[in-house]
Structures are given as structure tokens and as C-alpha cells.
Amino acid sequence: MDMSEKKQIRRNSRKKNIFFTYQIELAGSLIGIFLTVGLLAVILLIIFFSLENSSTTSPLPWQYLYSDKSEDMIKDAEGNIVPGKKEGPITLTFAGDILFDTHYAAGERIASAGIQNVIDPSLIQEMQAADVAILNNEFPYAEGGSPTPGKRFTFHASPESAENYRQIGVNLVTLANNHIFDYGEAGLKCTLEALNNAGISHIGAGNNLSEAADAYHFFSNECKISILSATDVEAGDHPDTRGATDTLSGVFRTVEDSYLLQRVREEKEKGFFVIVIMHWGTESTSQLNWMQEKQAPEIAAAGAGLILGAHPHVLQKIEFVGETPVFYSLGNFYFNSKKADTGMVKAVIDHNALQSVQFIPAIQSNLFTSRADEGEASRIFSYLNRMSGSATLQDDGTLKHR
């Protein structure tokens, strides 16, 4: 073999080595690309299924019942949202006034600390475990605008703060009160939108009287429950809080209560267990006013099976009107920095009958609402029992005829 042939062989060998090396590098690059694409695909699949699951089975802080105004959804044993109707009795909790306005101490503390850190965890658990948890939304959600001229106290909160309710298990709020119109028609409109956007149901105010006087309905296989919200405060001819009419937005105003009684009778005739939540009474006193004493028997006679009240900012007496329990005022649930007794009513309804009613005593103090300990609970029960002629609270808060 001459030198030229040997050189040609070496050149061919180098070409083969270069080609082989190139093939290895190319294969390595392709493998790297495939691995990267595969990893990205896995990540995308994980994100996709996470989003899908969060939108369909992520547990909310409450159990949905079937309602004519909400999805036909309940939770399964694991807390996932599944289609269907709730079996068995319905549990409801009721508490008094709450305020999200950050210009006041209570609202500022909620904004800075988080609502779950200003209310006793055991009280939050009661609301989250209930099928329906209700508070009085004592303010409008409003951005911009002007408060009612000449009104001493006016409130408003950011629309985003309506999401607070979801964190503590509240799924229905009452709007028939003397502050929901503090920022006028625009403020009320913003309030309805904010609550709707947050998925929080509401009663007692609307774009017209039909909406304001509309009941909220909850159904299980054994129960049909109707809840109404109304107010009789600001009894003068020119109230700061506008009553809704056929053409004007406002609250369900019942200083003259014939339409409220009609609505109770209508709901009762449809086969509902009717609950009425009133904004009534005189502020800062445990004494009932004449309108409370007049209206409670009328509402009960019209067919209400349970009546609860707010507005006085303090606890008032409990009584039975016939077989209808009346909690005249539940006080402030989380409203200001003052120390005050308060509480929560827990009602269980089965086969359209009230199975049990329990008062859970609590104390609002230093911008925290705590469940009362045994000693404080005994004191609050004794205080209420002294005022309440026909009703008595037992040691566990269960309400009984005296």
C-alpha cells in the first residue's frame, strides 16, 4: 500500500469518526429535546388537572344546598362539591352585625390581620359546618361616591372585602338595615354586584321592591326553608335609608308591616318553614320598643317558625310567641372595639319542623370575638334568662319553654 492510499484511509477514518461523533451529539441533543418536551408536557398536564379539579371539586367553606338561586351542589364526605340534594336535616347559624369598613377599628383589624384571625376558630367552625350561615351586612360596598349628607355615622367597604365571608363559612347576608344605603343608590348597586361576584347570597334589599322582599329558599329531601329580611328602623317620613318601590332600589322597609305579613303568609302557604330576620328595636338598650312588641306576634301569627333580630347592638331577651322562638337582638358579632356580650344561634330543621335551637354565647372584646368560656357562658345565660319570660336557656344553650 503506497503512501497516498494510507493517507486516503486515514482521511476516511477521520470522516467516519467525525460523522459518528456528530451522530452521537445529534442523538444527545434530540434526547435532551425529547426530555425537555416531555417534562413540559407533564408539568402542563399537572397544571391542567389541578385547575380542572380546583374548578369542579375544590371544597368551599360551606355546604351548598339545592336552592332556586344557586347551583344544585352539596359536599361529599371528603368535602368535595358534588351534584345532588342534601339528605337529612338542615343546620343554620345566625349572628349579628359585622363591619368591614377600614375607616373603623373593626374593619381595619380584619384587613390587617385577616378575618380568620379576629373570630374564635370554634365559632368559625360552627359557621363552616352549617348548611346556611348568616350575618347582617351592616354597610355598603362602594368605591368613590359620597355618603348620605348629614348622617352621623356612614360606612362603606371595598367590594373585594366581600370575599371575607367565604373564609368563615358565611353564605347568606341580610341587607335590610339602616346603613346599606349610606352611599345611596350607587352604593347599593355596587353592594349587590360585589356580593354576587363573591358568590354570597343576600336578602332584604334590591333594585326594586320585588327583589328586596324576595325570600331565599333552601331545600333538602326533607325540608323547604324560606328566609326573609326586613327593617322597620328610621320610622320617620324621610328616612336616610330608602325603602324599595316598584321602580326604585332600596331595602324591604316594613314600618307599616302589612306587606311583610303577606310575604310570610305566601311563603307559608307554599309549604316552607319560614324564618324572618328583622332589623328593628332601639340602639344600645336591652329594652324592647313598641314596634318589636307589636310586630313579633304579628309575624309569628302570619306563619314564621323562627324570628331573629339585629340593630340594638346589644343582646335582648328571647321569648316564645306561641311556638315561635324570637331572638329580639343578637347584638354585634364583629362591629367595633367595645367589649360586649354577643352570640350565635344554631337551629336544626328537619321535615319542616324546628328540631332544636341553641344559643352559643360569645364576647366581642379588644377587636376579637371569642366563644365564651364556661363561667362567662353561665353569666350570659343567667342575664338572658332573667329577661326572658317564656323561654329559658339550659346549661348548654339549648332553648326550651320555661
Question: Residues of each region from the PLM?
Answer:
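N-terminal targeting leaders characterized by basic, low-complexity, disordered sequences
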Residues: 1-23
